[in-house]
Each structure stands twice: as structure tokens, then as C-alpha cells.
Amino acid sequence: MHNASDIQSALVPMVIEQTAKGERSFDIYSRLLKERIIFLVGQVEEHMANLIVAQLLFLESESPDKDIFLYINSPGGSVTAGMAIYDTMQFIKPNVSTVCIGQAASMGAFLLAGGEKGKRFCLPNSRVMIHQPLGGFQGQASDIAIHAQEILGIKHKLNLMLAEHTGQPLEVIERDTDRDNFMSATQAVDYGLVDAVMTKRG
């Protein structure tokens, strides 16, 4: 029985290139990595975050002065995995330009906003959604209280960072992330999550 990721891997197209040494084949994502394009697709979780971080660090080592392009189509996911990607984006020398294709929700929206100012984009029919972090805990009452305190701290920290990236006042961010808040591409520009709607390349 094959799981969804096995099936998806089998469906990834291969690109064949002619070189001086003969033919070379790449999966499509590896070929795009040569153009400094990284795809962040699907749930944000630890394994995916490690791959994104590794690609960011590799591209920095290749050309520290050239922009990196991070294409995002994600429903969100783990805060800690997302913060690993975010911190690396801020840490490395190249500017990271973010582009929303499809959707950038929750942690996906946070990473979209965390791109280099002036280089954050949405495609015309993409959607962006911001909200507060989710938590579900079981166990002893004292442990639940500890986790509740932790998630409130994370919520406040994420709101502060989102306020910095969007230019919105903290109280506006706190109000707007209290529940799921969906935006069109143009609304995301108005809010400050991205800088422009990209309709054509160039």
C-alpha cells in the first residue's frame, strides 16, 4: 500500500538537459533550485522545514548576493517548524522574495509576510489567511495550564512580528487574528502582508 507522499514523489516530472558530458536528468524541483527557486508546498512540518532550511543555506553558499525566490502554497502547520524557516530567511545574506501561489494560510501567511520588504507578492487569484496559533492538549490540569500559557506567549510574539512586517498596529493584528481572517490578493496588499499582486513575470 503506497501512501500519498510516495504517489506524489512518483508523479514529480523529470527534466533532461544536454551538457558537455552528455545528458543529465533532474526532478523538476532540483532543476528549479538551480534558478534559485524553492517551493514550500503543503503542510508546514519538521521534515519539510528541514528541507527548506537546507535549500536556503545551500543557495546562500552558492551566491550570497543573489535573491532567493520562495513560492508558497500552504495551509499552514507547525509553529516551531515554521519558525525554523522564518529564522533562516532572516539569518541568511540573500534577500528572500516570497510569492503566494494558491494559498498561504496560518504559518504559510506568516512566512509570506516574512519575505524581503518590496519583494513579497501574491498571484491574482491566491488567498491569504491569518489567525491565532491553534493548540490541543491532553493530560494533567497543571500540564494543560503550562501549555496554555506557552501558546499565549507564542500568540503575542507572532502578533508582534506580524505587526512589524505589515506595518499594522499591534491592536489591529490582535483583533484580526482572533478568528480565521481570509483575504484576497489585493486585500493582502492593502493589509501589508505582501507588496504587490503579480500578474505577469517581469
Curated annotation (Swiss-Prot):
Xref: SUPFAM superfamilies: ClpP/crotonase
Subcellular location as annotated: Cytoplasm
Matches recorded under CDD domains: S14_ClpP_2 (cd07017)
Keyword Hydrolase: yes
GO cellular component terms given for this protein: cytoplasm; endopeptidase Clp complex
Catalytic activities: Hydrolysis of proteins to small peptides in the presence of ATP and magnesium. alpha-casein is the usual test substrate. In the absence of ATP, only oligopeptides shorter than five residues are hydrolyzed (such as succinyl-Leu-Tyr-|-NHMec, and Leu-Tyr-Leu-|-Tyr-Trp, in which cleavage of the -Tyr-|-Leu- and -Tyr-|-Trp bonds also occurs)
Catalytic site positions: 106 (nucleophile), 131
Keywords tagged on the record: Cytoplasm, Hydrolase, Protease, Serine protease
EC number: 3.4.21.92
Pfam family, one: CLP_protease
Primary location: cytoplasm
Molecular function terms, GO-annotated: ATP-dependent peptidase activity; ATPase binding; serine-type endopeptidase activity
Gene Ontology biological process terms in this record: protein quality control for misfolded or incompletely synthesized proteins
Broad enzyme group: hydrolase
PANTHER family named in the record: ATP-DEPENDENT CLP PROTEASE PROTEOLYTIC SUBUNIT
Protein task: Cleaves peptides in various proteins in a process that requires ATP hydrolysis. Has a chymotrypsin-like activity. Plays a major role in the degradation of misfolded proteins.
Family statement: Belongs to the peptidase S14 family.
Quaternary structure (record): Fourteen ClpP subunits assemble into 2 heptameric rings which stack back to back to give a disk-like structure with a central cavity, resembling the structure of eukaryotic proteasomes.
The name this protein goes by in its record: ATP-dependent Clp protease proteolytic subunit
